[in-house]
Amino acid sequence: MSFEIKLPTIEDRIKEIEQEIKKTKYNKATESHIGLLKAKMARLQLEAESHKKSGGGSGFSVPKTGDATVALVGYPNVGKSSLVNAMTHSGSEVGNFAFTTLRVIPGILKYKGCQIQILDLPGIIENASSGSGRGREVLAIVRNADLVLLVTDNEAKGMDKIIEELRKVGIVLNRKRKNISMKRANTGGIRIRKPKSLTLPEEQIKAIAKEFKITNAELYIRESVDSDDLIDFFRGNVVYLPSMIAVNKIDLPHDETKIRELNSFGKIAEVSASTGKGVEELKEMIYESLSLVRVFLRDKSGKIDYERPLVLTEGTTVRDVCRNISREMLVSFKYAILRSDRSKVNDMRVGLEYSVADGDIITIVSRN
């Protein structure tokens, strides 16, 4: 008699680690152990991802349009389609049952002179990151967004699980990329250059690195980090996105305490797509979260184009403004005349490296 030995799959091993993390109470004594478990899980997720990519398959394809893209992420039947319709009038199909949206439906929110693409995505379910319910295809769309709008309903359930599904595919919300770099070596082990203030033990840093098959390297850590930051760095395919939460169906009975608990995941907008309550406030919060910068162009005659501002992002300079208009303007640039609420001087001469802000009015003066 022969017995077939079934080896655990990568997904099986990931689930085992997830269960162990859930069972382990987090404290100072277990912090290092949990960090290593997370590192092992992240490495296995990378392996699973590479296997799935090599297998091919069709996915969703959505061209980016407008000045920024917002992806709506949430469980089925929380009212994402209704919310998109309330903001954009896109005609996304609505129903009182799960999985009404089976494809990505884009709409355009026109707000304060900006055109913001809103993506109504199919609802994700538990284990979406492993492929359940076409989850990996949905989550791949999210990676290219400028803002993630997490949508829940009056029951306010499962937000932590949704955020975890996003993290599993390398989407990290409301965190900044840490200043870490690495130079690989052939010998010498792992040498760490870090600030004195860093409390993460060197042994733990080295153990996490070794989980990602790094045994010889110079690792430069230039600010305070935790094990999650290190794992994200070694993983290498992580995107960092801002996010906020929309609690839909707020016109129905709900528990305010549960909704307040969502504050730990980001800013909250309480809305009702069916009655319109809070929809305008949600639009403003989306606009603010995107950190868009509208620059109004003024020609030599003094006419200002308030209808079609140039929409850029925070940190934009006069150089970026010129580059977005035309390369030729950048070459022939002499100076710019800026009118801004920030300055007491109404028409101030500025150069290419001057930072512009939302609402600034600018005239570009060329050499010829």
Language-model features and meaning:
Residues 23, 29-68, 73, 78, ...:
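C-terminal-of-GTPase-core extension/linker across diverse P-loop GTPases
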Residues 2-186, 192-200:
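Conserved G1/Walker A P-loop phosphate-binding module
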